[in-house]
Regions:
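Hydrophobic transmembrane helix bundles of membrane-integrated enzymes that assemble
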Residues: 6-222, 278-357
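Long extracytoplasmic/lumenal interhelical loops at the membrane interface
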Residues: 92, 225-294
Length: 357
């Protein structure tokens, strides 16, 4: 139930406050995080309450499809903002950017899609979770979505998601591994065979789209720039035999670890660096930032909170395990959380028992 998830969250919030008090340092973002969790939990309850009223009953699968389709809408907005500057101006006239967000978008405005916020690693993580959820959800039939639409959504999420953040590739890889495990367990289930057909159709459509773009639209500077950025790793794999990108090569230099036992245990209670454009100790690697923030004790509490949340949401063990593996993988690049996307799903238990996954 959500009560178990809330108890795990309380353990994490106490560690955050303890680290701040013991270090005598109250970083604005860091020390206010317990309040942020409380706000997310409250907003999640309100969202599910409204959906339950609007739909006359809400279930787990319908919420996840809403999350997926919301991401599709977010990506459509990304495309519009990239090719139509007036849309970009209207959006940012309504929603004000921080200095860090504005600087990041200015540096990458010609070679990647972007929308509200920096939307790079965070967006890639969200799209990855949605790709994995699509594969999980596609094992069932729905009245409100046709089976042939699913591979189109999957391909669209991956292609446009890669143009926003190449982290989206991680979601596709984990989703394919999950699909392989399902095939082994199903032993020839017709539903799974149909799912495999969908995936192969989606992969073929992506390959065909990439080929047509490369042949007929390479004279378009903007599209060529987007494609080169989105699929840099794949291009390098074919050309040099190594799946590397410019960002992945720099990433290993950002692995910086504490040099004292105090920081290893409870952290330094600091997230931001010397200015608003940098992180503490000049590292944005998830595991490093977690340890510098609140040490190994806080990191374990943080991971435990996400684990308990997934166990509340999913019933089938393989489903929450594969999402948890994807979550852990993201920490090798940046900090990713599950509470924003999965807390509303946990709130479903307060209204009715969700469909078993």
């Amino acid at each position: 139930t959500p009560i178990k998830s809330s108890a795990a969250s309380d353990v994490y919030k106490r560690q955050v406050l303890c680290s701040s008090i013991l270090n005598g340092r109250f970083d604005g973002f860091y020390s206010s995080y317990p309040i942020t969790i409380l706000l997310i939990t409250t907003a999640s309850f309100c969202l599910i309450y409204l959906l339950n009223k609007i739909w006359n009953g809400v279930d787990l699968r319908r919420y996840f499809w809403l999350l997926v389709l919301t991401c599709v809408g977010h990506q459509l907005l990304s495309i519009a903002m990239f090719f139509f500057p007036v849309v970009n101006d209207v959006v940012f006239s309504i929603i004000q950017q921080s200095a860090l967000e504005e600087r990041a978008n200015e540096l990458t405005i010609l070679n990647r899609f972007h929308t509200v916020g920096i939307a790079y690693f965070g967006a890639g993580a969200l799209y990855s979770y949605c790709i994995l959820l699509i594969v999980i959800l596609s094992q069932h039939n729905y009245k409100f979505i046709k089976g042939w639409v699913i591979p189109i959504i999957l391909v669209f999420l991956f292609a446009v998601g890669s143009a926003v953040s190449r982290t989206t590739m991680m979601g596709l890889i984990v989703a394919l591994v999950y699909l392989g495990l399902i095939i082994l367990r199903s032993k020839g289930s017709q539903r799974i065979i149909k799912l495999v057909k969908y995936v192969f159709c989606g992969a073929f459509a992506l390959l065909l789209t990439f080929t047509l773009f490369n042949k007929y639209i390479t004279d378009n500077f903007l599209l060529e720039s987007i494609i080169e950025h989105a699929f840099e790793g794949i291009c390098n794999l074919f050309n040099d035999g190594k799946f590397t990108t410019s960002s992945s090569e720099k990433m290993f230099d950002a692995y910086i670890w504490p040099d004292n036992l105090w920081t290893w245990l409870i952290g330094d209670a600091k997230l931001k660096g010397v200015d608003e454009f940098s992180y503490y100790m000049f590292t944005d690697i998830g595991w490093c930032r977690l340890i510098f923030d609140f040490g190994l004790i806080g990191t374990i509490a943080f991971i435990f909170m996400q684990w308990k949340l997934l166990k509340v949401v999913f019933v089938q063990k393989i489903n929450y395990l594969v999402v948890f593996v994807l979550f852990l993988s993201f920490q090798f690049k940046g900090i990713s959380e599950l509470i924003v996307y999965f807390m509303p799903a946990a709130m479903l238990w307060l209204f009715k028992e969700p469909y078993k996954k």
